[in-house]
Structures are given as structure tokens and as C-alpha cells.
Amino acid sequence: MGAVWLSHVSQLVCGCYLIEQSSCVLRTFHWSLSHSLNFTLTMKPKRRRLGVKMESFSLATPNMCFRKVSSELDSSFNGENVVCGLELEEKTAGDRNRIHFLEERNEETLSKRLRKLSRLDKVRSALELFDSMRFLGLQPNAHACNSFLSCLLRNGDIQKAFTVFEFMRKKENVTGHTYSLMLKAVAEVKGCESALRMFRELEREPKRRSCFDVVLYNTAISLCGRINNVYETERIWRVMKGDGHIGTEITYSLLVSIFVRCGRSELALDVYDEMVNNKISLREDAMYAMISACTKEEKWDLALKIFQSMLKKGMKPNLVACNTLINSLGKAGKVGLVFKVYSVLKSLGHKPDEYTWNALLTALYKANRYEDVLQLFDMIRSENLCCLNEYLYNTAMVSCQKLGYWEKAVKLLYEMEGSGLTVSTSSYNLVISACEKSRKSKVALLVYEHMAQRDCKPNTFTYLSLVRSCIWGSLWDEVEDILKKVEPDVSLYNAAIHGMCLRREFKFAKELYVKMREMGLEPDGKTRAMMLQNLKKHQK
């Protein structure tokens, strides 16, 4: 027999014999005792196994307790103290793994076995094989180590996972996948911020950075997305491009989703341009995000293009995507395209909801088709196509305001109140404005009084509309009462003076102008011009 090289081992058990050994080398023994000779002659080759009991990895990296890893992860990651700096604790003797005598010594073959055991989640068998290879000086390849590392993490054995990682690091057997797995482990134990700190420390060392690949960058970007760290996401994306890495479908989908979710739609569009240049397609979820980004950036043509590409690929855009696209096209005044998308929405089997109808009403309103807005609203209401909300009522009332349909506006207001919906100040303002346009000053005042009775607080726009309405109705006392009730507001005085000059009530205009100056309010240029132009005429 040749020499079998071992590290320091306190006890060796061969069959039923216990041999105390303190040296590093166990050489061939010449058995002098007869029972020893008989044992040697009768030993079967299949049972040639060194029953060396030892603690897993206790030769160079003792077992550790991971419950104190948090304090270490708070410090900077320097590669040397990820594992060694942790507080180590000896485990009980009952938790010892067995080192097997391996007949096979081919590292590639053993690596394949380790990969197979790891994929089957045979944790104990994989651990014994890994220990045995390491004990005999054999090194699994990086693929096998990563597979084993992933197996340990899947089964929650974080302690051994960090030990294996330290072994790989010392043997310079790490890859980008290795770092990716460990970033995920750190994120689970300590949080995403700690994992990102570890990533930044890795970036600072060129030797480690040479192992970076797209998978690792994807992991770091994903961690940023978990905590909505848009600035770090953008930085990692720029660094990845600077290193010459081309993103994958996952990379661009992550970037688009994060940027849209964090309100950086302009960056999402930049990502999309880069993706198109690299001839990479987005995933379905990222396409939804891009349609949303295009809506915010008023890129309706790009949103429509993405929507059409989804249909060509056999995808079924959801109702939210259809509504978003309709809204985008409606804001651009593309009414024809709006109703084409609506037809597609129906063909996909979606049932239009209140957002769909509001987008359609808004599209008609943007196209100045106010009569069509009211006609569609009446159809929605009469056929109970959806539950009417404040937005639908307001869209109808603003169309009434544009057309001067004060009666219909008042009717919709009372209907809205009767339905139990909360009527906002803006809704009352629309009705008062409709009365103003129709020269129904007294009706406007009644709506204002009704508004006050319902404890709805008026705003500056309410008073502006009331002042203009009362001036056109020659209700000068009411104008004066309104100005007395509210806090001094330069816009109200300017509007009142403009109206009075237009109605040729220069006396009242001059009184308001003097009062305005006494209160320290600064008139605008139009007010000054009107007063200078008509002051002499009024004095005569």
C-alpha cells in the first residue's frame, strides 16, 4: 500500500481497531499480531473505507454558528473576513460527518457526482462527498461548487454555505454565479442594504470584478428593486454598460419595472432604446410597465407600437394595459385609435370598467366633442355599464360647462349628491362656471349657498367664477359681499375691476382699485391699463 496523506486527525478507526495517531502521515502498517493479519486477509475490497470521524471542514475552516453573522455583515466586506471573522462554535460530537475513502480520484467525475447529489437535494450525501474530496486534496470544479452552494442555500444551511464559499474563495474557484448566490444569502439574512454594500466592496477589487457577469449584475439590480433604490439601480446599469456587458431579457425587464415603479419613466425609455439596439425583447410584465411609462412621457406612438407587438406575439394584454393605452391616445386627441383599441379590448374578452369609460369620455373631451361626451355618459348611465364615480360625473359636467348647459349641469350635480358620492369643490365649481357662461348669476349664487350648506369649502376658483357671474348679472352688492367675506386676494380684485370696466361701471372699479391699493395688493398690468385708460373719462 502506498502512503495515504491526511491532515491532523485525533482518532482513526479501522474496522474494530482504534488507533491513536498525532502525525499528519499514516503509512503502511506491518501487522504483527495474528488477529490483525486475519482481519487484513478477510477484509473485502468493497468495504475499503476509512472510517475517519471528523467534524465537517474542521481541518482548515472550523464549523461556525451563523447567528452572529449580522454584526460581521455590518462591517465592510473585504473577502478575508466573510467567514473567518465570524464567531466560531464547536458543534456536538453527534453532528459529525463521515469521510469516505474514495476509489475514484478523477476530479471531473467526482464533480459530476457532486452536481447530481446537489440537484437532487441530497444534502448529507453531497456534504460527505465534498468533505471527502477536500480531505483527499481533490478540488471540485466551480460548476459543482456552485451547485452544492445552491443546494445548501435552498435547504437553509447558511452556515455551511458560507464555509463552502470561503473554501472556494481561497482556492480562487469563484465565479459570478458564486457571488450572486452569496448576495442572495446575505440579503435573506441581513437585508438588501447589506447585500448591496457587499456588492460595492466586491466592485472595488479588480481581481474579483473580473469574475462579474450579467447574472451577478441582474442579482444586484433585483436587490435594488426590492427596496426601490432607483439611484443604485441606475449606477449599476451604467457600470455594467461601462464594463462591456450586454444585458439580457431579465436585465432590461428588471430595469424597466424598477424605473417605472419609482417614477423615472425617462430612464425606462432609455432602457428600451438600448434594448432595441441590442435586439432583445422585453418580457410581458415589462411591456405593461413600458406602456405606462409611455403614457407618462406622452409617447403614445411608442405605447401603441408595444401594444401591437404584444398582439403579434400572441399575448393577451390585460385590461389595465388597454385602459392605459386608451388614456394615452385620448390625451393626444387620437379618437379614432382610441375606439380601435376599445374594439380590441372587447375582442380580448375584457369587460370595460369605470377607468375604460372615463378614458373614452376624456378622449372625446380632448377632441372637443362635448356633445358626444354627454351622449356617451347618458348611455353608460342608462344601461348601467359601470358604477358611476366622481370622475365620470366631472367629465360630463365640464362638457356642460363648455356648452353652457347649466340646467343639465345642475341636474347632474343633484344626481351625484343623491347617489351617495362625495361631491368635491371642483364639482361645484364646474356647475357654477356653467351658470356663469350661461349668464345665470342667481342660479350660480344658489349653487354657492347650497355648497356652503353641505359644508363644502369654496376655493379661489369658486369665488372668481361667482364674482364674474355677479358682474355680468349686475349684482354689485353681491360682488361687494363676496369680496368682504374672503381673505384679501389680488386675483379676485383684478377680476372684479376687469369686469366692472368692461361693464363701464368705472365708479365701482375706482373704489375697488383704491381699496385694493390700501390693503397693499399689487394690481396686474391689465388692471393698471384699464384704470389709466378710463380714469379721466370717469372724472368728466
UniProtKB/Swiss-Prot annotation:
Residue windows of the PPR repeats: 106-140, 141-175, 177-205, 213-247, 248-282, 283-317, 318-352, 353-387, 389-423, 424-458, 459-487, 489-523
Species the sequence originates in: Arabidopsis thaliana (Mouse-ear cress)
Gene: EMB2076
This protein's name: Pentatricopeptide repeat-containing protein At3g29290
Family of this protein: Belongs to the PPR family. P subfamily.
Top-level taxon in the UniProt lineage: Eukaryota
Entry-linked NCBIfam families: PPR (TIGR00756)
Organism taxonomic ancestry: Eukaryota, Viridiplantae, Streptophyta, Embryophyta, Tracheophyta
Any one Pfam family match given in the protein's UniProt record, by short name: PPR_2
Keyword terms, alphabetized: Repeat
